[in-house]
Amino acid sequence: MIKSPSSLEKTNLAPALSQVSSDYDSVRALILKALAVIRSDNFDEYFDLFSEDAIWMMPSKYSDVNKAGARNFYRFTAKFRFDQTTSIDELVVADDWAFVRVSFDGYLRPKFEDGSPPLRSVSRHIWILKRELDGSWKIARDIWNNPRDLG
């Protein structure tokens, strides 16, 4: 695990290690933003965090889905919002790539009171991130499943 930014100020780091810390912090900030957006009422902002060539590997599907296909899949978020706890299970940054294992556990709740009950929503994801040409980080792949065994 990389030290927190406040503890890094107290040490003399080689430039390469300092860059690793900066990359880790940037990736972590992007992931935390993604988790906040997912739980917000502005789900469309989620897609801004993905690269233009992003691919989703959906559960139980043979074909991959591009950003337009993912927008289509998530159109239900116009009526429902995610009310989930999240867990960042692993975060690794290596050069221009990073990956994150993240778990979601909770419910989809109606945004508007229409008598619909909440729907159970549990998923586990691997997000693969890449550094863009401008130096920013974007999510490039979302590989996920819906576990049958809810632990």
Where on the chain are the PLM-derived regions?
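Short, low-complexity N-terminal intrinsically disordered segments enriched in polar/charged residues
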Residues: M1-E52, V93, L150-G151
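Short, conserved clusters of charged catalytic residues that mark active-site
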Residues: A29-L30, D83-T86, R124
